[in-house]
């Protein structure tokens, strides 16, 4: 999905809070991504996966979408 500005992207990310997400940390075509839950804590976005919490800056993500 393409966004015309950062505001749209930020609103999309906010809509994913509390949901399971599929995210990628590389642009490798063979990377199938990881599944986690996007949470918000003290104003920070955290991805929880297998009981671990990852604090990841949005610019570090190559892809993020709701996992279905």
Model-inferred region functions:
Residues 36-38:
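Conserved glycine-centered beta-strand/turn positions repeated across beta-sheet architectures
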Residues 1-32, 41-42, 46, 50-68:
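Short glycine-rich, low-complexity segments
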